[in-house]
Curated annotation (Swiss-Prot):
Protein name, UniProt field: Large ribosomal subunit protein bL17
Organism: Sulfurihydrogenibium sp. (strain YO3AOP1)
Disulfide bridge partners, by residue number: none
Keyword Ribosomal protein carried by entry: yes
An individual GO BP term: translation
Gene: rplQ
Length: 121
């Protein structure tokens, strides 16, 4: 029974699941958009939105927390210098998810595109 279990496991252990979201978040920050399955996109949304909210604070402590969670200083720097200032006036809702028409070959998983609402081109 799944009583009081809020997170999806994606059939991975905790460390593997964290690594999955860190890598997807890095790709999203560097490229502005990522194509993945719909459940992963929905889970990634909450992970990334918490990071952007932290980066908006613009304190040394928040910068260290972002770098610690992303495990990459270059990506963290891009997040709090380029992306976070775009969302200074916005209180959440930094990403949008589009459902894609074609399904994944093999298991037929529903594909989605997750992107930042305002991203510099």
């Amino acid at each position: 029974m799944r009583h009081r279990v809020k997170t999806k496991s994606f059939h991975r252990k905790k460390e593997q699941r964290e690594a999955l979201f860190i890598n997807l978040a890095k790709s999203l920050i560097l490229n502005g958009k990522v194509e993945t399955t719909l459940p992963k996109a929905k889970a990634l949304r909450s992970f990334v939105e918490k990071l952007v909210t932290l980066a908006k604070e613009d304190t040394i402590h928040s910068k260290r927390l972002v770098a610690q969670r992303l495990k990459d200083q270059k990506v963290a720097k891009k997040l709090y210098t380029e992306i976070a200032p775009l969302f200074k006036e916005r209180n959440g809702g930094y990403t949008r998810i589009y459902k894609l028409e074609n399904r994944r070959i093999g298991d037929g998983g529903e594909k989605a595109l997750i992107e930042f609402v305002e991203y510099p081109s």
